[in-house]
Amino acid sequence: MDGVGIVTTRFYEWSQCLHLESGAQLGSLTIAYETYGELNAAGNNAILVLHALTGNAHIAGRNFPDERYPGWWDPLVGPGRALDTRRYFIVCANVLGSCYGTTGPASINPATGKPYGMDFPAITIRDMVRAQKILLDYLGVKRLVAAIGGSMGGMQVLEWGFLYPQMLDAIIPIATCGRTTPMQIAFHHVQREAIYADPDWQGGNYYGTAGPRRGLALARQIGIITYKSDPSWNMKFGRNLVDPRKYFQLEGQFEVESYLAYQGRKLVDRFDANSYLYLTKAVDLHDVSQGRGSYNEVWRDFPCPCLGIGISSDFLFPPYQVQEIVRMINDGGGHARYAEIDSPYGHDAFLIEFNQLAAIIQPFLKELRPDLAA
């Protein structure tokens, strides 16, 4: 089956104030997004895909003919695929606070004519979702077949269920949690500390210079460790050395060390350090019960059917966290089911195990809206 071909990233300019959960506001907002398929006349065949921490709106196809890689969920999007563009209108927006076209710390502050830097206000997962709702209203989407996403994207999915349940047929959170744990917060803390410790961070006012490349690269390396599993490290690298002749030298590298350094360099070339700070903090602040009562009670009468998907080897978001969401929805009188990706690839499996994901998601979507699956 062919994919979606060449796609264009578009930009929506919202000229009104966006009021944030912190009480701060943004005077205007730009949202970068991509769409696939066609919105039907009723405006009710849309699926919203939410991306993870350093992701973007480019989930499928290529932005130009010789682009090296297609979008990050390309095998799932297109005619006849799990997110079937013959039936569904697929939308993905770059999140608020990121650096792929949506307003974030690297954007120009209209009050100063300079990048926001650390003057950018604190943002939360709920703020991201409210920005996405603005975009969907602009696009004419009246109802979503589903909101779906993994990791930080799964957090957005859950908040969609709390903020706009009347607009959803169902939610599909993947490899995520209802509130971040101390371990998850701890890993983000040391990643942010790596950026702060780089003198080139300059208090966040590094635009126009090289910026904190070493700090961001180290932060990424720490993050990469949490995205894998012990079996996946063993399968990929074992104890192999880059150069066995340097076995007893401090600068000698195991292949796993070389890989981490490479991943750090890759991110530095495509991501903004301040966005990394703001987005990891938004993840740390994630708690669906914040301002809504107790965590145990907030799931009572949850209005959206839920398909929660865990990953068997996930170290960062262990499957019990998705299982807990499903259990609490069901115990509260709602309707939820659980499925699991059986994979050695750890948290990254939702970006790798496309066949398993398709086998889980596709029948669920057809069951939700048989009128669209005919």
From Swiss-Prot:
Enzyme class: transferase
Pfam entry (one): Abhydrolase_1
Catalytic activity: L-homoserine + acetyl-CoA = O-acetyl-L-homoserine + CoA
Record GO terms (molecular function): homoserine O-acetyltransferase activity
Subcellular location: Cytoplasm
Record GO biological process: homoserine metabolic process; methionine biosynthetic process
Enzyme Commission no: 2.3.1.31
CC annotations in GO: cytoplasm
Active-site positions on this chain: S151, D314, H347
Record's keyword terms, sorted: Acyltransferase, Amino-acid biosynthesis, Cytoplasm, Methionine biosynthesis, Transferase
Matches recorded under InterPro entries: AB_hydrolase_1, AB_hydrolase_fold, HAT_MetX-like
Family (UniProt): Belongs to the AB hydrolase superfamily. MetX family.
Subunit structure: Homodimer.
Its job: Transfers an acetyl group from acetyl-CoA to L-homoserine, forming acetyl-L-homoserine.
Full protein name: Homoserine O-acetyltransferase
Source organism phylogeny: Bacteria, Bacillati, Bacillota, Clostridia, Moorellales
